[in-house]
Amino acid sequence: MVALRLIPCLDVANGRVVKGVNFVNLRDSGDPVELACRYSEAGADELVFLDIRASVENRKTLVDLVSRTAKSVKIPFTVGGGINSIVTINDLLRAGADKVSLNSSAVKNPKIISQSSKKFGTQCIVIAIDARKKHNVSNEWEVYVKGGRENTGLDVVNWAKKVEELGAGEILLTSMDGDGTQNGYDLLLTKTVAKAVNIPVIASGGAGSLEDIFDVFTEGEASAALLASLLHDKKLTIEEIKSFLINKKLIIRPNEK
C-alpha cells in the first residue's frame, strides 16, 4: 500500500506566504523558500505552492520562486496559480517543479489537461478543484474558479470524473467552506470525490487537529492531507502529526533520522 502523504501548502501573494479564512483576510506567514526548507527538513512528504494572486491579476506564477525552491529542497513540490499554457507548464517544470496545478485554466479550456498530460506525463498534472456546498444542499458541491470568486455552476463530482478522463494524475480538492477555519476537513466531500475517481485525492481546507488529519485519511479516504494554517501558526509540527498517525497504525513515511 502506498504511504499516505502530508503536504504543507504555501499560498503565495506578492512573493510572500499568506493565509486567510475562507480565501479572504490574508495575513503574512513568511518567506516561501525559507518555509519550504523548514517543512522539508521537518519531514514533509511534498510541498504545494499556490500563487493565489496570479489567476485574479492574470500574472504568471514566478519561475524564479520555483528555481530557488528547487535548489533548496529535496522533496517533490507542486506549483499552481495562473498557469494557462503549455509553455508556462514547460517553463515551471524546467525550473524545477515536479508537478503543476491547474484550476481556472482547466475549467476554461479542458483540452489543456489532455495536452499537458500527453506532453509531460499524467504524474505532472494536478487539477485543483475549489468546492463549495450548493446552497441548502448537504451532499452537492459546485466548482469555483478565480481564487474562489467565481461560481462555474459545474458539479464537483462530475468535474472530478472528467479531469481524470482527460489525463489528470491527481486532484487537489479544497473545501472553500472549511478553508483556514481549522474546524476539520469536509469528510463527506472528500470521500464522495475519492470514491468517484481512481486517482489520488489530496484533501484541503479545515485541518485543525491531529484527529482531523486521522479522520480525513480513514473516513475521508484521502491519499494525502494538505496542511496550511495549522503548521504556519505552529499549532502542530509535521513530526507530531506523523508520530500520531503511525501510532494509529496508518501507513506513513517516517521521518529520516
UniProtKB/Swiss-Prot annotation:
Compartments in which it is found: Cytoplasm
Pathway where this protein functions: Amino-acid biosynthesis; L-histidine biosynthesis; L-histidine from 5-phospho-alpha-D-ribose 1-diphosphate: step 5/9
Pfam families reported for this sequence: His_biosynth
Reactions the enzyme catalyzes: 5-[(5-phospho-1-deoxy-D-ribulos-1-ylimino)methylamino]-1-(5-phospho-beta-D-ribosyl)imidazole-4-carboxamide + L-glutamine = D-erythro-1-(imidazol-4-yl)glycerol 3-phosphate + 5-amino-1-(5-phospho-beta-D-ribosyl)imidazole-4-carboxamide + L-glutamate + H(+)
EC number of the protein: 4.3.2.10
GO annotation terms (biological process): L-histidine biosynthetic process
Keyword GTP-binding: no
Active site positions, chain numbering: 11, 130
Primary subcellular site in the record, as a coarse category: cytoplasm
Key words of the record: Amino-acid biosynthesis, Cytoplasm, Histidine biosynthesis, Lyase
GO cellular component entries: cytoplasm
GO molecular function list: imidazoleglycerol-phosphate synthase activity; lyase activity
Enzyme class, first EC level, given as a word: lyase
PANTHER family: IMIDAZOLE GLYCEROL PHOSPHATE SYNTHASE HISHF, IMIDAZOLE GLYCEROL PHOSPHATE SYNTHASE SUBUNIT HISF/H IGP SYNTHASE SUBUNIT HISF/H
Chain's role: IGPS catalyzes the conversion of PRFAR and glutamine to IGP, AICAR and glutamate. The HisF subunit catalyzes the cyclization activity that produces IGP and AICAR from PRFAR using the ammonia provided by the HisH subunit.
Entry's family note: Belongs to the HisA/HisF family.
Subunit structure: Heterodimer of HisH and HisF.
Protein name: Imidazole glycerol phosphate synthase subunit HisF
